[in-house]
């Protein structure tokens, strides 16, 4: 064994692995296998000789366990107390408990290890777990530590841990909880196997046609691996990554600059030793991502074949290798974590502890931000790295300086004294997975809400709110209820607290319909009065006319009525406006449709002719309106209208023909009247035929006569006498003008018959309900009624009139009275309790009682019963509070809600103070009565809401704006036109006038402009705002002219009215802010809350940004805001929502997150998880668009997340980078006043570079998931797959190419097409890069056979057939399906020698072959 260093150390699993790897590299696989066999026998031999066994005695429990549990319990009790005092929220308490337990569990594990290491190093459990033979730490922890926190079926962590371990045995509760986790483990294993199999299938389908096809693709691109000075640890990682790759640029000695290694060398372990020696830190490497080949990779870009550590062979199916390598660990990942059965593990935090006692001081340069952690502590977070100093107690000791990194949580305040070994800081864990939920906080008791005013910190938009609920009993009653007592009053059991009378409207006798015990469902009918109809008959019609089914004959007048049969009784149905019956009459019937005219002004004749109507008393004016119908004339012009759809040639009459009555217009359609035919056409079809009756005269001079009315006896044109009132109308016929004389029919509006003569009220005289008749117009004036049916112009109806409002519960019953030959009309009213209760009390606990009996006759306004609320037990009342909003709310504070405490316990407390007793938590509340030695407390419970939006602050200080974007008017951009820009800035009451400045735009390319504007900065409350102002506006000036606030007119600038074309203005409304001067703002209850900012822009018509105010200093550390829904001194019921708290939950980091996460990255899912109802902050998932400094002067790089530790959407990343590379930006010169446009790089390079960024992002994301699980996958495999995901682009503009918009095509393909098109001098196509997930990429395979055998077979085949695609059978899958030899490995096609000349082949062969060939 040459060059093997003798190892005199413990050889565990890791060292064994290294040993075998060494032998594999230096010798070959056969030798390595032999060595492994030898090692196996060695192990068995010594294991059997040592006689290692495991018994229950080997499981030793550390003796500190009980102490630790006690300590943890104490911490939890403290957390409960703090919660009850209102210092932390419910959510934070939960978090505190979980943190306490997970910390206890971790430290117990440390204890176990410590114990084994120091006292019992040969313990068989210890040997087993730590040699890597079987089992791991978490399992040993469960055997001898504590089982720890479990997650419930939905994956949430339960806040009660299992404190026992398996050595001690579990209690019943523990066993059940443990069962949750175990079941989860079993189910997950099954699911994960399936998932991981499917992942492998998709991966192989994507990569199946990627082979090694060439020796070298001659690419100029390379991957750069470099190491900065700080990260020397990661140097070994990088050496691992570059092992077996090929260098693309030569490596120079950093000191002498001579070439150490030429380009194109394979990196071997020996070379890596050389790099370490010369301290090389930059490597330019070839990688599958840089390979130029299309759907293939060359030998040099791929590097070693990992199975034999040599350069890969040509024809190797590396795509399939890659798919298998990525998918296979998936199954392992699943199995790996679940031996423990769903245990919650949290990574140990990196903490900073103090070495000595002393006072802590922060450096001035250390910038910190206040943050409330999810455990409810206010801590400082460092925004930059710096240091703190400890000043020790002893003067002999030196000062201790502790370096602090960025994003460290610091627990102590400045100048705080600290004992040795205290945790003063811990690093924020940025890569943990967190989901934010919203938890509603419900009230435990009913009572009143009190919000004490907390001290405000200046300039904070979010502040903390404390909410007290002081207990009391809440009763809701109607507003007009009567309250039964005064304060300090004793109430007996079942006495009422308030009571409201229920009073009836109509007199009548009582009848119960159903006798339900629940009063709200009980129906009571009160029979009211009767009417009798004399000489009348009721007959049923065979079929209903106008939905009416009975005929009521009332002394010769026939009425149509609608009647419903129910329980053999006839009930009269009334319509919405209480119309009961309609009179049948033919006097106002017309033959056909037409136009009706009457003077509708005349209908309302209430006010005096000369009275002036006062504008302000408009309301009364409406109330005085009572429609009084004056009796007058209706004028009717008949006109027959047919709606038809037919061709012209079917028509039997032409436009302008005069026809007789009964003429056939189209086959089967006859006219009812004679007259002139008018035809309207639509799309060459006949739409309507109308026939206007009358006489027709042809001729020329009608101007004088048209549109006039003539009376009988007059003569037109000195020879045409008129016999009936007529209206002359001028129509255009076929070819000549015609005058149509249309007869006018006149109907007189009738007077009413009094109906009360025919009806006798038999029951009681002062009846509330009357029947009366009424005449109404059926149609509005000047309305053309199309049609040929008979119309009733006027209808006479019977209506039911009631003095009271409640008419929806009326029943009208008709019955024949046999003796008197009359028809009786009985009116009864249903009485339902629900109609008396206002809706907001509907579901509150109101009780009720009735005071009436069946068949009792009651008068009007009798008390029917009470709505009331009773007490369930006797009370002694201490205080009452009343509040009247939409209902009367009564809060009783009785003895049960109060506590009496001795005064000497709480010294210095006065009336209305709040008390929290730290020893006895029950003594918490507000003092409401005090005397010599006792205090009476009203019990209460505080609720704490941190980081609420402060409602008061926002209106006063924060600048709010709203941009209103108009419809965009874009004028034609012609060259060298002087555009005018004017910026008008006017408040509600003032106006700014400004200089106009002209600008000529010199721009050669007809390119769509996206202009950038210079910014106007506004500073307010320490926040900066920018407002976009058009360029060249450094010259503008604002003139403001102020008016007195009482001057109400808004003056509009005159200039604006004239220049309307091409103007695009945006209006900006700001809530009154200090920036705009607004005199109205200070007036009380002024309506002018909004100031107006108006920008008018001229040349920048395509500007995509709306001009407005933008906040520059976005607070990146802003937390999600919590909301509180109740207001001070409200009364609240039990179980109402007080507010919402946001809580962050850490998700257990096992492969439950792993596989789906890998799938999500490889499928390039667009994550839109915004649920609408959760008020999340808008900054979720935003990426930085420009590299810039933020408020804390931190550099934020392009394409990084604004909020830290968040998943990036790869599609957005691609877009951000492509915009950055490919966007056309204007460059504006102020002196010459001209604009030029340029972009960073061309379309192809922009796409290529942004793809490279996304590729490295996806690679890192997937590797991060696998590495967190301890699975090592070589980057090559992932790179092969990622290369397949990032080849396509989406065409956005086709140019002169034969492509279509939104077509998806390969990047190299479109580049080739564009080169050809440009060489011919034509317009090339534009495109944007497109990222496809693995499923999409597999379906977009150029071979349709491969795609169809993967998914969506019919769709793929149909599409291929329509497009007429050809499958060239390049990949493996197509060939297998067709039945050919697969083109990989030995079957890979070797076309090298096919095209060479014969003579060349012959010259290379040896002579002896030659002779064979010639024979």
Swiss-Prot record:
Note describing how the cofactor binds: Binds 1 Zn(2+) ion per subunit.
Major location category of this protein: plastid
Reactions catalysed, as given in the entry: RNA(n) + a ribonucleoside 5'-triphosphate = RNA(n+1) + diphosphate
EC number annotated for this UniProt entry: 2.7.7.6
GO annotation, cellular component aspect: chloroplast; DNA-directed RNA polymerase complex; mitochondrion
Subunit structure: In plastids the minimal PEP RNA polymerase catalytic core is composed of four subunits: alpha, beta, beta', and beta''. When a (nuclear-encoded) sigma factor is associated with the core the holoenzyme is formed, which can initiate transcription.
Name listed for the protein in its UniProt record: DNA-directed RNA polymerase subunit beta''
Species in which this protein is naturally found: Phaeodactylum tricornutum (strain CCAP 1055/1)
């Amino acid at each position: 064994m040459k060059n093997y260093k003798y190892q005199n150390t413990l050889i565990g699993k890791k060292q064994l692995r290294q040993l075998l790897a060494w032998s594999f590299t230096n010798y070959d696989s056969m030798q390595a296998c032999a060595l492994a066999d030898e090692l196996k026998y060695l192990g068995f031999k010594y294991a059997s000789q040592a006689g290692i066994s495991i018994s229950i005695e080997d499981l030793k429990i550390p003796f500190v366990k009980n102490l630790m549990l006690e300590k943890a319990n104490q911490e939890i009790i403290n957390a409960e107390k703090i919660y009850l005092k209102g210092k932390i929220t419910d959510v934070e308490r939960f978090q505190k408990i979980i943190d306490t337990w997970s910390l206890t569990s971790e430290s117990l594990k440390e204890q176990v290890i410590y114990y084994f290491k120091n006292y019992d190093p040969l313990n068989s459990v210890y040997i087993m777990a730590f040699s890597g033979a079987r089992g791991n730490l978490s399992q040993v922890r469960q055997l001898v530590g504590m089982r720890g926190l479990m997650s419930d079926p939905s994956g949430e962590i339960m806040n009660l841990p299992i404190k026992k371990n398996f050595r001690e045995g579990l209690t019943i509760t523990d066993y059940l909880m443990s069962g949750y986790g175990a079941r989860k483990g079993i189910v997950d294993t099954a699911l994960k196997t399936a998932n991981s199999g499917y992942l492998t299938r998709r991966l192989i389908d994507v990569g199946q046609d990627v082979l090694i096809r060439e020796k070298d693709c001659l690419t100029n691109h390379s991957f750069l691996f470099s190491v900065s000075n700080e990260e020397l640890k990661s140097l070994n990682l990088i050496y691992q990554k570059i092992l077996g790759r090929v260098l693309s640029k030569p490596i120079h000695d950093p000191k002498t600059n001579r070439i150490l290694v030429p380009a194109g060398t394979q990196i071997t372990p020996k070379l890596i030793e050389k790099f370490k020696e010369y301290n090389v830190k930059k490597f330019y490497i070839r990688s599958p991502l840089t390979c130029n080949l299309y759907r293939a990779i060359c030998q040099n870009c791929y590097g070693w074949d990992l199975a034999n550590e040599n350069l890969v062979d040509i024809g190797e199916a590396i795509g399939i290798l890659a798919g298998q390598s990525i998918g296979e660990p998936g199954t392992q990942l699943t199995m790996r974590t679940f031996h423990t059965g769903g245990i919650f593990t949290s990574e140990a935090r990196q903490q900073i502890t103090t070495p000595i006692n002393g006072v802590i001081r922060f450096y001035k340069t250390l910038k910190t931000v206040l943050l409330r952690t999810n455990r409810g502590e206010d801590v400082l977070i460092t925004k930059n790295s710096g240091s703190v100093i400890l000043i020790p107690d002893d003067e002999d000791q030196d000062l201790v300086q502790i370096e602090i990194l960025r994003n460290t949580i610091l627990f102590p305040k400045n100048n705080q004294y600290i004992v040795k070994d205290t945790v003063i800081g811990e690093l924020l864990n940025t890569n943990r997975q967190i989901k934010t939920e919203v938890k509603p906080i419900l009230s435990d008791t009913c009572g009143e809400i009190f919000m004490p005013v907390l001290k405000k910190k200046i300039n904070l938009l979010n502040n903390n709110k404390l909410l007290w609920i002081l207990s009391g009993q809440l009763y809701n009653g109607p507003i007009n209820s009567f309250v039964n007592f005064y304060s300090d009053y004793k109430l007996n059991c079942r006495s009422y607290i308030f009571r409201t009378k229920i009073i009836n409207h109509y007199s009548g006798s009582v009848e119960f319909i159903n006798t339900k015990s629940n009063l709200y469902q009980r129906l009571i009918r009160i029979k009211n009065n009767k009417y009798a109809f004399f000489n009348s008959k009721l007959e049923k019609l065979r079929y209903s006319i106008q939905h009416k089914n009975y005929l009521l004959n009332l002394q010769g007048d026939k009425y149509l009525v609608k009647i419903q049969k129910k329980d053999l009784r006839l009930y009269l149905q009334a319509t919405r406006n209480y119309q009961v019956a309609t009179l049948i009459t033919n006097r106002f019937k017309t033959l056909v449709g037409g136009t009706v005219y009457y003077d509708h002004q005349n209908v309302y004749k209430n006010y005096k002719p000369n009275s002036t109507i006062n504008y302000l008393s408009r309301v009364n004016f409406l109330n005085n309106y009572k429609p009084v119908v004056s009796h007058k004339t209706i004028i009717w012009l008949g006109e027959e209208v047919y709606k038809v759809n037919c061709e012209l040639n079917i028509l039997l009459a032409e436009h302008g023909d005069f026809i007789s009555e009964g003429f056939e217009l189209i086959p089967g359609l006859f006219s009812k009247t004679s007259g002139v035919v008018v035809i309207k056409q639509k799309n060459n079809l006949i739409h309507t035929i109308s026939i206007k009756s009358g006489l027709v005269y042809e001729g020329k001079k009608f101007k004088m006569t048209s549109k006039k009315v003539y009376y009988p006896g007059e003569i037109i044109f000195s020879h045409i006498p008129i016999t009936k009132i007529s209206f002359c109308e001028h129509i255009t016929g076929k070819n000549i003008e015609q005058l149509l004389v249309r007869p006018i029919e006149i109907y007189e509006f009738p007077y009413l018959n009094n109906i009360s003569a025919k009806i006798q009220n038999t029951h009681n005289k002062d009846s509330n309900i009357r029947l009366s008749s009424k005449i109404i117009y059926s149609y509005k004036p000047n309305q053309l009624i199309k049609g040929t049916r008979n119309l009733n112009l006027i209808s006479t109806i019977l209506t039911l009139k009631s003095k009271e409002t409640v008419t929806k519960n009326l029943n009208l019953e008709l019955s024949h009275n046999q003796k008197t030959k009359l028809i009786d009309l009985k009116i009864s009213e249903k009485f339902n309790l629900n109609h008396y209760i206002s809706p907001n009390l509907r579901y509150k606990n109101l009780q009720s009682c009735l005071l009436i009996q069946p068949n009792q006759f009651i008068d009007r306004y009798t008390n029917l019963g009470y709505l009331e609320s009773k007490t369930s037990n006797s009370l002694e009342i201490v205080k009452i509070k009343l509040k009247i909003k939409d209902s009367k709310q009564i809060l009783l504070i009785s003895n049960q809600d109060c506590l009496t405490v001795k005064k000497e316990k709480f010294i210095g407390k006065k009336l209305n103070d709040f008390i929290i007793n730290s020893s006895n938590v029950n003594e918490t509340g507000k003092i409401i009565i005090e005397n010599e030695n006792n205090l009476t407390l009203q019990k209460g419970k505080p609720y704490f809401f941190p980081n609420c939006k402060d409602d008061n602050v926002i209106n006063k200080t924060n600048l709010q704006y709203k941009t209103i974007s108009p419809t965009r008017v874009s004028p034609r951009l012609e060259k060298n036109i002087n555009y005018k820009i004017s910026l008008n800035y006017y408040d509600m009451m003032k106006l700014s006038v400004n200089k106009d400045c002209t600008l000529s735009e010199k721009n050669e390319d007809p390119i769509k402009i996206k202009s950038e504007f210079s910014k106007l900065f506004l500073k307010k409350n320490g926040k900066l705002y920018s407002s976009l102002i058009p360029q060249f506006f450094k010259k503008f000036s604002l003139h403001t002219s102020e008016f007195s606030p009482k001057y109400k007119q808004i003056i509009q600038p005159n200039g604006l009215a004239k220049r309307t074309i091409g103007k695009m203005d945006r209006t900006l409304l700001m809530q009154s802010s200090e920036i705009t001067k607004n005199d109205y703002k200070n007036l009380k209850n002024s309506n002018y809350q909004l100031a107006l900012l108006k920008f008018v822009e001229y040349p920048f018509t395509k500007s995509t940004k709306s001009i407005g105010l933008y906040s520059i200093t976005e607070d990146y550390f802003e937390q999600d805001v919590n909301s509180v829904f109740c207001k001070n001194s409200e009364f609240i019921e039990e179980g109402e929502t007080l507010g919402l708290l946001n809580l962050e939950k850490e998700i257990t980091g096992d492969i439950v997150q792993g596989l789906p996460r890998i799938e999500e990255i490889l499928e390039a899912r667009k994550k839109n998880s915004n649920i609408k109802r959760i008020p999340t902050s808008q900054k979720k998932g935003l990426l930085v668009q420009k590299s810039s400094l933020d408020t804390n002067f931190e550099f934020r790089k392009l394409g990084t997340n604004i909020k830290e530790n968040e998943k990036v959407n790869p599609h957005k990343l691609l877009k951000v980078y492509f915009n950055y590379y490919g966007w056309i930006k204007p460059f504006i010169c102020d002196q010459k006043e001209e604009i030029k446009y340029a972009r960073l790089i061309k379309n192809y390079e922009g796409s290529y570079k942004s793809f490279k960024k996304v590729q490295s992002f996806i690679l890192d994301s997937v590797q991060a998931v696998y590495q967190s699980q301890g699975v090592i996958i070589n980057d090559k495999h992932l790179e092969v797959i990622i290369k397949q995901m990032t080849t396509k682009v989406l065409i956005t503009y086709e140019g002169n190419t034969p492509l279509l918009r939104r077509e998806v095509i390969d990047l190299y393909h479109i580049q080739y097409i564009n080169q050809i098109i440009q060489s011919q001098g034509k317009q090339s196509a534009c495109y944007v890069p497109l990222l496809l997930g693995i499923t999409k990429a597999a379906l977009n395979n150029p071979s349709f056979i491969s795609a169809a055998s993967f998914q969506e077979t019919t769709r793929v085949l149909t599409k291929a057939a329509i497009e007429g695609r050809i499958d060239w059978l390049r990949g493996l899958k197509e060939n297998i399906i067709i039945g050919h030899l697969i083109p990989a490995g030995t079957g890979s096609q070797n076309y090298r020698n096919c095209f060479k000349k014969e003579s060349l082949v012959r010259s290379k062969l040896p002579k002896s072959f030659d002779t064979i060939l010639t024979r």
